[in-house]
Amino acid sequence: LLGVHLEGPCLSSEYKGAMPEHLLMHTADAELFAKYQKASGGHVRYTTLAPEIPGVPGLIPRLNAMGIVCAMGHSGAGYDQCAACVDAGVRSVTHLGNAMRLFHQHDPAIFGVALERDVYVEAICDGRHLHPGTVRLYLKAKGYDRVVAVTDSIMAAGLPDGSYKLGVNDVIVENGDAKLPNGVRAGSTLTMAQALRNLMAFTGE
């Protein structure tokens, strides 16, 4: 086990995606993260935080000290909030372009900071979450050494269509597309091997 990505619980309610609302935290709590790290045997290596959650900028150095790399995502934060989190130690952006406020010319928000600053950006390479041209844009803006192909997959990865679980949520997979009963996309069924094949197809490499 290389490590666990703890995607939450300090995430925006507005941009939570398929995350259950009642499990989100609306104030950063370093002690809770310390408990998670202890319970995992020290295997939490990466976490996603929304910069607008009160206390998150101050939490970042404390998590880094626990050996946890901090990313930002599932967020509606503005440019200044996101830039402050990068200054505090954020090193990556979780599935850029999905479950977040998008670029606007008057406030580039998390998307603008992701492309401007020296951070890694994740791209879900299933052809559903991002248009292939968007993935090429990331590569052109960031370079191959700063773009990370990810799956965002759930337990249905590589399995037939049907009914599955995502934590406490029921998920329906049709034509390989995973969604909650209300139609909200719930991760993917992508395997890492297929993500890399897709990335090569998107880029012509």
Report each predicted region and the residues it spans.
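Active-site core of metal-dependent hydrolases
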Residues: E31-L159
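Catalytic cores of large soluble enzymes that bind and process phosphate-bearing ligands
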Residues: M25-A28, D126-L130, V184-T191
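Short, flexible micro-motifs
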Residues: L11, P20, G76, M155, ...
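Divalent-metal coordination cores built from histidine and acidic residues
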Residues: L1-H43
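His/Asp/Glu-enriched, well-ordered alpha-helical/loop segment
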Residues: A109-A123, K140-T151, A156-E205
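A polyampholytic, Gly/Pro-enriched intrinsically disordered region
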Residues: M25, T94-A99, N169-E174
